[in-house]
From Swiss-Prot:
Name recorded for this polypeptide: ATP synthase subunit b
Transmembrane segments: 11-31
Organism in which the protein naturally occurs: Sodalis glossinidius (strain morsitans)
Function, as annotated: F(1)F(0) ATP synthase produces ATP from ADP in the presence of a proton or sodium gradient. F-type ATPases consist of two structural domains, F(1) containing the extramembraneous catalytic core and F(0) containing the membrane proton channel, linked together by a central stalk and a peripheral stalk. During catalysis, ATP synthesis in the catalytic domain of F(1) is coupled via a rotary mechanism of the central stalk subunits to proton translocation.
Gene Ontology terms for molecular function: proton-transporting ATP synthase activity, rotational mechanism; proton-transporting ATPase activity, rotational mechanism
Length: 156
């Protein structure tokens, strides 16, 4: 056997084996590898999309939280303003009531003072009349007394 013929036979067998493999074994193997690459790429793309969706959801949640805090702060400020307004209104009402009571009391005091002055004037006039009556030692009738007292009160 010739070594060259053996090598040539082995080369032909190898070429036939390679052709057979390229025709029948290689395409399904490559299809399987490409399918697996596609699945991996789709999985990575899906993971990337999920990460982006998560980032978007977190950003939206943060925005909603900030908006809720702003709204809560606005509600608190509005409540504080309303509280201050109610307190101011209550103070104003109390001040008005106090002024009303003071004015009423002052009016009562003035009326009482006026009545006391009138009473005092009448008593002073009666005392003066009694003193004058004792000095003169004569009796004046009650109608004349009343006229004299009224005149004296009017003069005082």
């Amino acid at each position: 056997m010739n070594l060259n013929a053996t090598i040539l036979g082995q080369a032909i067998a190898f070429v036939l084996f390679v052709l057979f493999c390229m025709k029948y074994v290689w395409p399904p193997l490559m299809a399987s590898i490409e399918k697996r690459q596609k699945e991996i790429a789709d999985g990575l793309a899906s993971a990337e999309r999920a990460k982006k969706d998560l980032d978007i959801a977190q950003a939206e949640a943060t925005d909603h939280l900030k908006q809720a805090k702003v709204e809560a702060q606005a509600i608190i400020e509005q409540a504080n303003k309303r509280k201050a307004q109610v307190v101011d209104e209550a103070k104003a009402e109390a001040e008005a009531e106090r002024n009303k009571i003071l004015a009423q009391a002052q009016a009562e005091i003035d009326a009482e003072r006026k009545r006391a002055r009138e009473e005092l004037r009448k008593q002073v006039a009666m005392l003066a009349l009694a003193g004058a009556e004792k000095i003169i030692e004569r009796s004046v009738d009650d109608a004349a007394n009343s006229d004299i007292v009224d005149k004296i009160v009017a003069e005082l």
